[in-house]
């Protein structure tokens, strides 16, 4: 069904509405939920037929990878753009961080903000992304303990901080890292809905770059990296959706394709974002808080309503509140769409650690595993 026809005349719902209302409302997007395959239904059957032949597992169609339609140079440009775009959005947005909307305005990378940063310096969004990128670069895969330890070094010692100290960290992230220090893998916190902050969404680009050949690996590893600090269901849902959108953009999709509704198994709030309702909302209907649903919706709204990297970042940052995180999230997808080549050269030159960030993105690009690990898993499942 055509997206514009589907949404025409519909009053966009507030994603802060009660769960019961949202669940009922989201039924209109049931066509975006995949049907259970015969193979999966057979394995889920409470009373399976004893003599029925066991159907082989196959990868569902909705997890099909997008073939890369870019030249190698274009693909690297977009990969670097996703990670550098995160840092640039962070550095631009920090000026208005914690400010009420329209109490100030930013039109350039000027620093300042609550932490009185120099122009080009960034906050915890980028620091965490660099910890994640370092994990992939050093291990050639995602490793929970390596990532958690890197995050602790940032928290305690200022590693991967633009100014050598951890001056900004979310409460949920702090609690998780202290839990890791105390209990290691035995710690299983931050599952509550009240912990559904944006801390793992804002650092996601390294996973999408490293797993660029496989949508299924991107989908699941978006959740795995999140689980180090954020395990609430809504965070996992938003990370999966955003990871899938980054996968499309990194492999050549334009804005319309990357942000178009796709068949995906998502719960109501993420499903409604996937359906694209944010595209029809006004600025007044968009929230820019640290709640993961607000952050993702605001970032996608800013990218959808612009046609270049600079304008997307400024539109996101000027929403204020958690401005750095909204702009960092917008910067990931805008950078993956427009590449470093589409960024203002003065921002690329000014943002802290610009060369290192681009080199790290290139390293993840080169290390990206070929093929689809889910296909290998399924081929050996019988």
From Swiss-Prot:
Listed name of the protein: ADP-ribosylarginine hydrolase Tri1
Lineage: Bacteria, Pseudomonadati, Pseudomonadota, Gammaproteobacteria, Pseudomonadales
Catalytic activity: N(omega)-(ADP-D-ribosyl)-L-arginyl-[protein] + H2O = ADP-D-ribose + L-arginyl-[protein]
Ranges where the record places region ADP-ribosyl hydrolase domain: 81-373
Organism: Pseudomonas putida (strain DSM 28064 / B6-2)
PANTHER family for the chain: ADP-RIBOSYLGLYCOHYDROLASE (PTHR16222), ADP-RIBOSYLGLYCOHYDROLASE-RELATED (PTHR16222:SF12)
Positions that bind Mg(2+): 123-125, 168, 324
Signal peptide: none
Transmembrane segments: none
Keyword Amino-acid biosynthesis included in the entry's annotation: no
Uppermost EC category: hydrolase
Start and end residues of each stretch annotated as N-terminal extension: 12-72
């Amino acid at each position: 069904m055509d997206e514009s026809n589907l949404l025409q005349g519909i009053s966009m719902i507030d994603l802060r509405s009660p769960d019961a209302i949202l669940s009922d409302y989201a039924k209109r997007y049931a066509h975006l939920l995949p049907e259970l395959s015969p193979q999966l239904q057979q394995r889920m059957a409470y009373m399976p037929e004893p003599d029925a032949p066991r159907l082989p597992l196959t990868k569902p169609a909705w997890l099909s990878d997008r073939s890369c339609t870019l030249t190698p140079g274009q693909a690297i440009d977009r990969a670097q753009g996703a990670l550098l775009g995160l840092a640039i959005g962070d550095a631009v947005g920090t000026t208005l961080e914690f400010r009420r909307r329209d109490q100030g305005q930013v039109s350039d990378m000027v620093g300042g903000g609550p932490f009185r940063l120099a122009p080009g310096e960034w906050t915890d969004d980028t620091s965490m992304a660099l910890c994640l990128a370092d994990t992939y670069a050093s291990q050639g895969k995602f490793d929970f303990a390596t990532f958690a330890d890197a995050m602790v070094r940032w928290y305690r010692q200022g590693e991967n901080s633009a100014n050598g100290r951890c001056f900004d960290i979310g409460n949920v992230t702090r609690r998780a890292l202290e839990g890791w220090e105390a209990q290691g893998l035995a710690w299983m916190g931050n599952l509550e809905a009240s912990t559904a902050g944006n801390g793992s969404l804002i650092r996601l680009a390294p996973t999408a770059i490293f797993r660029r050949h496989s949508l299924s690996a991107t989908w699941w590893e978006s959740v795995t990296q999140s689980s180090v600090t954020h395990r609430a269901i809504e965070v996992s849902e938003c990370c999966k959706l955003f990871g899938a959108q980054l996968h499309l953009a990194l492999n050549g999709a334009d804005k319309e394709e990357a942000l178009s509704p796709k068949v995906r198994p998502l719960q109501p709030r993420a499903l409604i974002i996937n359906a694209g309702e944010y595209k029809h909302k006004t600025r007044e209907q968009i929230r820019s808080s640290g709640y993961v649903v607000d952050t993702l919706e605001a970032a996608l709204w800013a990218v959808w309503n612009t046609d270049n990297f600079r304008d997307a970042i400024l539109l996101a940052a000027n929403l204020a509140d958690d401005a750095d995180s909204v702009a960092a999230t917008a910067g990931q997808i805008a950078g993956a769409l427009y590449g470093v080549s589409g960024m203002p050269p003065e921002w690329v030159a000014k943002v802290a650690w610009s060369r290192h960030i681009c080199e790290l993105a290139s390293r993840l690009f080169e290390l990206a595993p070929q093929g689809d690990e889910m296909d290998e898993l399924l081929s050996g499942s019988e």
